[in-house]
Amino acid sequence: MLAKRIIPCLDVRDGRVVKGINFEGLRDAGSILEQARFYNNELADELVFLDISASLESRKTTLEEVLKVSGEVFIPLTVGGGINSVERAKEVFLHGADKVSVNTAAVNNPELISRIAEKYGSQAVVVAVDIKKIGDRYIVHTHSGKQPTEYEALEWALKVQELGAGEILLTSMDRDGTKEGYDNESLALISTSVHIPVIASGGAGSLEHLYDGFTKGRADAALAASIFHFRQHSIREAKQYLHDRGITVRL
């Protein structure tokens, strides 16, 4: 059985790690490099670096920051934010990223997924899917959650899989930063409908929430920020907790 992964996420804005609630109310969560070093030493399985204002403000991810982080960590690094072309993806890879995450640009131009996958392999393409429950439907949003799209979550997940995505990073906007647990209903819906890995995101506030994301949500990996950034729990502690409850993790 493949080991479940624990992935801390660095949401970066103006050169600092930040964390908000429901994609709003950002507060400072420390230095990018200090957090990256910490997670590298904490046995994180991977690290995600998201420039959360890049697409919204039509800025490009700061390559210098990516280069610094990639020089500090020896675990797979996924970089997202403002990646809207194969050429931009190439620059990010050349600065040390192992994977790129696309979101807004993929919705605007779905063929971008295929083009990056054809050049670098599906394993290097993560499609970030931000969803919000409207009525009884999970609607995909773009531009840092500001703009609803025509896509429902499952429809878009199946489409990105067909286009060559290697993973889906599924974030519940309703749960983001709330520490109320992942939206395991939407997680299970997507995880059981696609054959590529699904990363749970949005809402982790306890070690039990990580466990639930794997068991109830059927996720392949759990992404978290608040509980790790502010040292509520360590990744080592989280992995031991999961291991003790029968979840296969890398210790």
Swiss-Prot record:
EC number, UniProt record: 4.3.2.10
Protein species of origin: Chlorobium phaeovibrioides (strain DSM 265 / 1930) (Prosthecochloris vibrioformis (strain DSM 265))
NCBIfam families linked: hisF
Enzyme class (EC, first level): lyase
Active-site residues annotated for this sequence: 11, 130
Reaction(s) this enzyme catalyzes, per UniProt: 5-[(5-phospho-1-deoxy-D-ribulos-1-ylimino)methylamino]-1-(5-phospho-beta-D-ribosyl)imidazole-4-carboxamide + L-glutamine = D-erythro-1-(imidazol-4-yl)glycerol 3-phosphate + 5-amino-1-(5-phospho-beta-D-ribosyl)imidazole-4-carboxamide + L-glutamate + H(+)
Single GO MF annotation: lyase activity
Chief location bin: cytoplasm
Lineage: Bacteria, Pseudomonadati, Chlorobiota, Chlorobiia, Chlorobiales
InterPro entries: Aldolase_TIM (IPR013785), His_biosynth (IPR006062), HisF (IPR004651), IGPS_HisA/HisF (IPR050064), RibuloseP-bd_barrel (IPR011060)
Protein name stated in the entry: Imidazole glycerol phosphate synthase subunit HisF
Cysteine disulfide partners in this protein: none
The UniProt record lists the keyword Zinc: no
Protein family (similarity comment): Belongs to the HisA/HisF family.
One GO term describing the cellular component: cytoplasm
Subunit text: Heterodimer of HisH and HisF.
Protein's cellular compartments: Cytoplasm
PANTHER family documented for this protein: IMIDAZOLE GLYCEROL PHOSPHATE SYNTHASE HISHF (PTHR21235:SF2), IMIDAZOLE GLYCEROL PHOSPHATE SYNTHASE SUBUNIT HISF/H IGP SYNTHASE SUBUNIT HISF/H (PTHR21235)
